[in-house]
């Protein structure tokens, strides 16, 4: 007889093979066609808000794994909060101005930006940005990320630009905007100033040189020293030879000792502590010290520039250290921030002998016309020829490069517009402490950055961006910016966008009758610089959070990569504090970078770049989403094909757990078949307790943004509590009991609750799979169209906190583990095949024996053996013996029983199975 026809075997349309790459697009269509995101919002419309403000990715190129990690983490936050009942509108955004897009357009059109019509050029830049917004939008949606994709914010939106102008105006009104000559990062390739956030450091090999500056006025300090007519030189050390034409001073430290060292034919001055190192590096064996002076004694000594007709003044500066070089610092105020500041104190003028394109000017003398990098060799040759070159050393150092063109940048003093961070630094630091930083070290990182940072250079010498809304009087050159001019420009931009600045005449951009407040002239010129793109995105909180009814300022969270401490987190904080006196966010959460399987940075040259779509097209977006939580995302995340393949195995275990649960609930309707808590079998109550503990821990992990913990908890629950234990034990009563028996319905009641809860717990992470499971639950208590329209699972506190139940089942599982080892030995010795082939004898004494006897039936069920006997033992430790089971094997349930075949119809089944088939 085919007994399988009498069993309640699993039935489900939920496939074992996920085929995520093929199946996921169906769920994308389902979510879109049924407006699931909008329905999520509608469901929670009157509840507390949770607003995550999206940091705008740059609209050029396809998304990379860093983008994917970022957007998936945001999606996890939002979906969890929504399931918890929060109202979670999410407005994706794009950063659309700036250098990278300009460069792409120049490359595409093959034009010189200085010769092209600005309005036409800006039009091409806009088209380029919009085309990539469309591409990236589809790519982000493919990840399963929910949001207002058809109504995002863009920094090129006229309303955004108008709000940005008003933010600028508010800062100017408070005195935080000024124009000044200062050294800034300058990219000669891109011909523009750069912000610190636009700088990337790379390891460069270069030459450092030791240069002698002849002392021509010692202030009488050396008069009483017997120098034998030898010349005295102060030795400086530099890694940027090309800046020597800009040298105007030599900085010493007030408190350091400086030695006059006789090296035979001349006297050299270096910091006393560095004498030995400097002499060794420059291969000088014979030397002795003549005298020592404090740095402060040498102040105002004058030296002759080694190749220009100019003097270099000895000055004092706290920035001088003994970490490298000679303790005597080459000082060029046009090429360094500290140089600029220290020279300012001495009223030393600033010269900048390098032009916008990086070529040396007439102020560099015979080196004029050379590209700054090419001048290094020529200057070194000149120094050697004139006997001013003491030595050369090859070094490796971290040097700043342009974030976009990847070429080295220089420090160059130019007239730029700045936001005076000094003006509101204390407020900004206080605002940092009002924010929750996750991880906690983020607080110290941004605090120190703001405490130490200089004023923010906000002007750029480019075309594609929001113009700096300032005018200059043609007569007296006074800058003009007032409430009226800002309001007038903002209103124009709101209607026409910032293109109006380039297409309209000055008179149209100014309120009628505008006069210079100084000289009364009515003729003006426009500022030609645009704003730093970090000012664009840094103003997003003002536009996005305040202009949309369903959002609020400040928002709850910013979530970006940890490079944004010096980028968006900081620019947003600065504009917010300057205009509103507080941070625009309550929580800042950061993640690390994506690196390859060996922990190396991904780069095209290394050939180790993995696209998110390499993974999605082969394994599915849910596997990529699982990867996002598979490690501690607050540090760098490794990825490789091997890592992804390992994750598919973990995913399969979660999926198979869901499939088993679904397959055994095909005939269970919770509305009619549910068993009350008081009537549940004890093993089912234990399983519920395990579920409730899982819900409690997973909820805590989600609340703490510890998604890696969620991943481990869910995986362990599926494998250890479910597959290896509860579900395996349940198979017999699920398949072999009467379909409507209390025994089976008790199991189904709990399995239904486990399935529903598990589906919700994984939904923020495995969104596609959770939706697929939800759609395959035939009968549901919650009549929700989508898993994302349900509520977070709740726990039964009585069961959760039932310590007696927990202690009892901990003992039972301990016994199971001991027995399992002996069963494995018996299996290896070919005594048994399946555990049902066995009879187990447990030898125990005292309380443990009594415990096993009292719970013999439960323990036998848990052990999945045909017979269990308990006998008196002689040790405190239980002893286990395994035998072949007594009786015959039931052909229906495969248990051994001495009563198999002893029934009216002589069927080879056990008494339990006979009762079932007899009825059938």
Curated annotation (Swiss-Prot):
Q: Which cofactor does it need?
A: Zn(2+)
Where is this chain's protein located in or outside the cell? Cytoplasm
- UniProt name for this protein: Isoleucine--tRNA ligase
> What does the domain comment read?
IleRS has two distinct active sites: one for aminoacylation and one for editing. The misactivated valine is translocated from the active site to the editing site, which sterically excludes the correctly activated isoleucine. The single editing site contains two valyl binding pockets, one specific for each substrate (Val-AMP or Val-tRNA(Ile)).
Q: What does this protein do?
A: Catalyzes the attachment of isoleucine to tRNA(Ile). As IleRS can inadvertently accommodate and process structurally similar amino acids such as valine, to avoid such errors it has two additional distinct tRNA(Ile)-dependent editing activities. One activity is designated as 'pretransfer' editing and involves the hydrolysis of activated Val-AMP. The other activity is designated 'posttransfer' editing and involves deacylation of mischarged Val-tRNA(Ile).
Assembly and partners are described as:
Monomer.
For this chain the motif 'KMSKS' region maps to 601-605
Keyword list (alphabetical) reads: Aminoacyl-tRNA synthetase, ATP-binding, Cytoplasm, Ligase, Metal-binding, Nucleotide-binding, Protein biosynthesis, Zinc
Which residues bind ATP per the record?
Answer: 604
Which PANTHER family does the protein's record reference? ISOLEUCINE--TRNA LIGASE, MITOCHONDRIAL, SOLEUCYL-TRNA SYNTHETASE
